[in-house]
């Protein structure tokens, strides 16, 4: 049986000027091209056809955007779309949306303390003033908890809701349950400074959101509201001009963002 000596070609030489095509005496130019359309050369040499693309959807407000992948596992992926001061997450190529419900949090903007129950232990202080909730545990073993009841109409009880919570100065401990102090609807979680959107399905006529702090310094909550219907977005500090300078890295289920 005769031996075959197949030729091995390297297609990663890339594109060169037409004036250089005649320089076949230069090893690197022998397999270069003046035009390379719909081909993807790789560093190690092979080249393949560029995969097809298709229109999925417009960016938020048709604005310039940068997409950052989120990959937690093979079946847990998302896309973080950054546009002008807005972050819009997408799952399975569709934005996360909030349903239309009639539920609301009375005095969720803390314009008044009516309806809010403030409990302090160990010389701590919890105040609602100037449109803010401020909690401060000045003494060791101090604790502040602030909660209220939120009514859910019968037609909305099986519909997914979301609390939109703005923290001016964190961290703040938050939970929500079917009874005061419980967390059977939203498990106890720590909210850092920023805007948060926490989804939940009430399955009850009344739910009880609660804020808590054990810290010996001021923590400040700006507001808690029920998300309006439509695509869920979050504010960011990055304007359109900042988008090319965004850098990111992911660790488990956390994406760290920076901007040069």
Please identify what each model-predicted range represents.
Residues 1-99:
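N-terminal beta-propeller domains
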Residues 60-63, 75-260:
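Polar, enzyme-active/binding microenvironments
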């Amino acid at each position: 049986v005769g031996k075959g000596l197949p030729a091995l070609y390297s297609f990663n030489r890339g594109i060169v000027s037409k004036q250089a095509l005649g320089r076949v005496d230069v090893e690197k130019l022998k397999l270069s091209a003046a035009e390379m359309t719909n081909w993807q050369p790789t560093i190690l040499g092979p080249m393949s056809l560029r995969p097809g693309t298709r229109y999925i959807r417009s960016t938020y407000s048709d604005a310039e955007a940068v997409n950052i992948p989120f990959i937690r596992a093979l079946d847990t992926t998302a896309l973080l779309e950054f546009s002008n001061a807005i972050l819009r997450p997408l799952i399975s190529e569709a934005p996360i949306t909030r349903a239309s419900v009639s539920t609301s949090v009375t005095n969720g903007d803390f314009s008044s303390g009516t309806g809010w129950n403030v409990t302090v232990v160990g010389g701590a202080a919890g105040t609602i003033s100037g449109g803010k909730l401020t909690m401060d545990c000045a003494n060791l073993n101090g604790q502040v908890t602030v909660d209220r009841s939120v009514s859910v109409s019968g037609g909305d009880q099986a519909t997914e809701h979301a609390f939109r919570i703005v923290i001016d100065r964190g961290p703040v401990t938050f939970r929500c349950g079917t009874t005061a102090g419980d967390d059977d609807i939203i498990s106890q979680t720590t909210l850092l400074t920023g805007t948060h959107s926490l989804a939940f399905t009430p399955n009850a006529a009344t739910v009880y959101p609660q804020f808590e702090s054990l810290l010996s310094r001021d923590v400040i909550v700006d507001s808690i509201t029920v998300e309006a219907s439509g695509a869920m977005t979050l504010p960011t500090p990055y304007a359109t001009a900042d988008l090319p300078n965004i850098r990111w890295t992911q660790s488990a289920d956390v994406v760290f963002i920076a901007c040069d």
